[in-house]
């Protein structure tokens, strides 16, 4: 019998509340399938939060007539475009799980500094009201990816120095047009990078544990 929508929501919430194992061999051990399920759920949640925040910022501060031209100018703005990471699902399927985990970790870690300023910028919105927890959510996903890497690491050379730059902090001066455009660009990159990390994790989960949700 198929699970009801309510049961599915409860299961997803329960998985999000599960802690990561602190070390390999910890008892009781969490199955690899659960590690992947947790990581995917956390990445999906962060990606959706980033997308909602981007849209709300856009509606609040960016005139509709300027959005298209600004979005085109943002194409080469993201530092993550300088690393040899897959740009979509098809390319991701050509990479090993270890490579995808390393790229995911790099993307997440590049935002740990900037997002600490997010709550200082956005204070008057239901969406922005959750921004003070984004850092905690990113750290949680970082720990989950590191747990997966401990399980799958094959001893091959690490890729931890590929992304030497991180992103600038968000600008709190919302009366400045330059600051608004900077924040708009940062939110665009944040959304794109979390979409990449989510895609990589879903590709890995689907090819290891074939399931109906693999079509994305």
Swiss-Prot record:
Q: What is the lineage of its organism?
A: Eukaryota, Metazoa, Chordata, Craniata, Vertebrata
Question: Where, by residue number, does the polypeptide cross the bilayer?
Answer: none
Q: Which PROSITE patterns match?
A: SOMATOTROPIN_1, SOMATOTROPIN_2
- The name this protein goes by in its record: Somatotropin
Q: Where in the cell is it found?
A: Secreted
Which SUPFAM superfamilies has this protein been placed in? 4-helical cytokines
Signal peptide start-end: 1-26
Instruction: Say what the protein does.
Output: Plays an important role in growth control. Its major role in stimulating body growth is to stimulate the liver and other tissues to secrete IGF1. It stimulates both the differentiation and proliferation of myoblasts. It also stimulates amino acid uptake and protein synthesis in muscle and other tissues.
Q: Which residues bind Zn(2+)?
A: 45, 198
Q: Which GO terms describe its biological process?
A: animal organ development; cellular response to insulin stimulus; growth hormone receptor signaling pathway; positive regulation of multicellular organism growth; positive regulation of receptor signaling pathway via JAK-STAT; response to food; response to nutrient levels
Keyword terms, alphabetized: Disulfide bond, Hormone, Metal-binding, Phosphoprotein, Secreted, Signal, Zinc
């Amino acid at each position: 019998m198929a699970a009801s929508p309510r049961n599915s929501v409860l299961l997803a919430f329960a998985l999000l509340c599960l802690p990561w194992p602190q070390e390999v061999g910890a008892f009781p051990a969490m199955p690899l399938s659960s590690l992947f399920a947790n990581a995917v759920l956390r990445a999906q949640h962060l990606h959706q939060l980033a997308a909602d925040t981007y849209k709300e910022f856009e509606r609040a501060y960016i005139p509709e007539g300027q959005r298209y031209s600004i979005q085109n100018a943002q194409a080469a703005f993201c530092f993550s475009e300088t690393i040899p990471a897959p740009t979509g699902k098809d390319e991701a399927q050509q990479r090993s799980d270890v490579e995808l985990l390393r790229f995911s970790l790099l993307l997440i870690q590049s935002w740990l500094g900037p997002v600490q300023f997010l709550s200082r910028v956005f204070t008057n919105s239901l969406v922005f009201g959750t921004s003070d927890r984004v850092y905690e959510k990113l750290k949680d996903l970082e720990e989950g990816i590191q747990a997966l890497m401990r399980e799958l690491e094959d001893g091959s050379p690490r890729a931890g120095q590929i992304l030497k730059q991180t992103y600038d902090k968000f600008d709190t001066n919302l009366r400045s047009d330059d600051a608004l455009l900077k924040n708009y660009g940062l939110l665009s990159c944040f959304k794109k990078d979390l979409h990449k990390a989510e895609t990589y994790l879903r590709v890995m989960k689907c090819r290891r544990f074939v399931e109906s949700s693999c079509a994305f």
